[in-house]
Swiss-Prot record:
GO molecular function: acetyl-CoA carboxylase activity; ATP binding; carboxyl- or carbamoyltransferase activity
Metabolic or biological pathway, per its Swiss-Prot or TrEMBL entry: Lipid metabolism; malonyl-CoA biosynthesis; malonyl-CoA from acetyl-CoA: step 1/1
Protein's organism: Prosthecochloris aestuarii (strain DSM 271 / SK 413)
Entry protein name: Acetyl-coenzyme A carboxylase carboxyl transferase subunit alpha
SUPFAM superfamilies noted in UniProt: ClpP/crotonase (SSF52096)
Superkingdom of origin organism: Bacteria
Catalyses which reaction(s): N(6)-carboxybiotinyl-L-lysyl-[protein] + acetyl-CoA = N(6)-biotinyl-L-lysyl-[protein] + malonyl-CoA
Enzyme class, spelled out: transferase
Length: 335
């Protein structure tokens, strides 16, 4: 079924899906009227059109450009952190406040239980993530998923609490960046993010980070240091957004598509570069096409990764995590 929000490259598919829906309505009416000849003709037309829809859907979504994946990552109907928490976990207890200044609604977190009966797995975890809104009112409440310093300090407080009780940490990353306002700078935005990098590298519990949508710059890495970095298929992760990169290099946002290509910010790019460890496949058309399937796929991956990490010694965990991030990037000492 077509979604309410249609991206430019999805319009041909959306039009076909609308036509298919109209024909199905006509088929039901024809069946009620006992018009056998018309019903048989409509069935044949619907079958032909369904084949066209499936072919076009595969053609579009299996050949997405980097910029088109950025657009999908920003789709307003994608599942957000709280959606994943309630679909994947039980008994979520939200914990609020950084105990210094305020409670940042752009980051949510708390204890929850993740269970998988088939794998005989049940574990209490600390889950933390960026939270966006779906309309103007909720986006203002969540600050469009752009965390303030108190958001990162809240996240760190919850991580240290998890460490105290020996519980694994799962972070869900989906942000256009840390909030760049003057008030955030005055309250130590850079220090808060830097402190999180230091502390997360040394947490003596398993840490799994998942980029579920946008992974922009320091706003993402502020809760993005872990033993395993997972990324859903149509997410993006980069030091800068394509629009901002285009604005800096070409003094205009109109080169954002070229910027996206140059940044190599997709899951496939980052897996090849060794930045992430695993790609979580999305339903054809994006996570918003089937949120429940997406959540189940991610949950299965999390259970697998947690099962492996929880068998490791604490000292081994920290040592491997530090070496993992120290090895990232390319260095030229002769330049």
């Amino acid at each position: 079924m077509a979604t309410k929000v249609v991206l430019d490259f999805e319009k041909p598919l959306f039009e076909l899906e609308e036509k298919l829906d109209e024909m199905r309505v006509c088929l039901k009416k024809s069946a009620r009227d006992h018009n056998t000849a018309e019903t048989e003709g409509l069935n044949q037309e619907i079958e032909t059109l369904e084949s066209k829809v499936q072919g076009l859907r595969r053609s579009i979504y299996e050949n997405l450009t980097r910029w088109q994946k950025v657009q999908l990552a920003r789709h307003s109907e994608r599942p957000y952190t709280l959606d994943y928490i309630y679909m994947m976990m039980q008994d979520f207890i939200e914990l609020c406040g950084d105990r210094h200044f305020a409670d940042d609604k752009a980051i949510v977190g708390g204890f929850a239980r993740i269970e998988d009966s088939e794998a005989s797995f049940s574990q209490t975890v600390m889950v933390i993530g960026h939270q966006k809104g779906r309309d103007t009112k909720s986006n203002l409440y969540r600050n469009f998923g752009m965390a303030q310093p108190e958001g990162y300090r809240k996240a760190l407080r919850l991580m240290k609490l998890a460490e105290k009780f020996g519980k694994p940490v799962i972070t869900l990353i989906d942000t256009p960046g840390a909030f760049p306002g003057i008030e955030a700078e005055e309250r130590g935005q850079a220090e808060a993010i830097a402190r999180n990098l230091i502390e997360m590298a040394a947490l003596k519990v398993p840490v799994i980070c998942v980029i579920i949508g946008e992974g922009a710059s320091g706003g993402a890495i502020g809760i993005g240091v872990g033993d395993r970095i997972l990324m859903v298929e149509n997410a993006w992760y980069s030091v800068i957004s394509p629009e901002s990169c285009s604005s800096i290099l070409w003094r205009s946002w109109k080169y954002k598509e070229q910027a996206a290509e140059a940044l190599q910010l997709t899951a496939e790019d980052l897996l090849q570069q060794g930045i992430i460890d695993r790609i979580i496949p999305e339903p054809l058309g994006g996570a918003h096409r089937n949120p429940e399937l997406m959540a189940n796929t991610l949950k299965t991956a999390l259970v697998e990764e947690l099962s492996a990490l929880m068998r490791k010694d604490r000292v081994e965990l920290v040592d491997e995590r530090v070496r993992k991030f120290a090895a990232m990037g390319e260095w030229n000492e002769d330049a």
